């Protein structure tokens, strides 16, 4: 199965004072560069969902805008999946600096077994570290047109395979590998992790 890696870079970064969080430098590279470096080895191609392509041109990757602007993360996931050259899209956020290829492989190993393959950590489904098949598109579109934007809102209409937390934990601390940098406090924590653990 051909799988496209999709980096979601459509957020407004309002909690970071408007500075695009993906472009913040951490450990000598911009966060989005760490994201691409983590997923590129395990997918067939990578694209970026963004409404500001000029900011991400330096990556040299295909870029697509939101099909449904201002429809939140579900709109971004839909746009990336629709544009994906593969039969499925491995979707990640642009602000996850500690993503790891080996953790991604746990998800991708189950490609073809379900329409959504997604890790669960406690009560949280990691919707921005998940594999979505093209079979999800009509169900996503119906929710988007109805303005029902909760990502998991269409899950009861497709086959979902959850990856147990302990599978992730065998390789990495889920609190680190799935960490988002949404706020200045989270950025400070990421810098501390970078200093203490390196790569």
Question: Model regions: which residues?
Answer:
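Nucleotide and nucleotide-moiety/phosphate-recognizing core
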Residues: 1-148, 156-175, 188, 192-198
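A residue-level signal for conserved active-site and pocket-lining positions in enzyme catalytic cores
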Residues: 155, 183
């Amino acid at each position: 199965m051909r799988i496209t890696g999709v980096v979601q870079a459509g957020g407004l970064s309002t909690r970071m004072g408007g500075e695009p969080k993906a472009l913040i430098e951490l450990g000598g590279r911009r966060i989005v560069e760490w994201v691409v470096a983590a997923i590129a080895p395990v997918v067939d191609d990578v694209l970026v969902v963004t409404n500001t392509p000029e900011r991400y041109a330096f990556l040299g990757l295909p870029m697509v805008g939101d099909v449904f602007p201002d429809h939140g993360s579900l709109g971004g996931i839909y746009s990336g999946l629709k544009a994906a050259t593969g039969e499925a899209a491995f979707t990640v956020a642009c602000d996850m600096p500690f993503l790891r290829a080996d953790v991604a492989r746990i998800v991708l190993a189950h490609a073809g077994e379900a329409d959504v393959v997604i890790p669960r950590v406690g009560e949280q489904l990691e919707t921005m570290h998940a594999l979505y098949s093209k079979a999800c598109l009509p169900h996503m579109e119906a929710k988007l047109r109805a303005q029902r934007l909760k990502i998991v809102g269409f899950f009861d209409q497709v086959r979902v395979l959850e990856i147990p937390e302990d599978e992730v934990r065998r390789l990495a601390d889920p609190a680190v590998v799935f960490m988002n940098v949404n706020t200045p406090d989270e950025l400070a924590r990421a810098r501390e992790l970078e200093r203490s653990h390196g790569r």
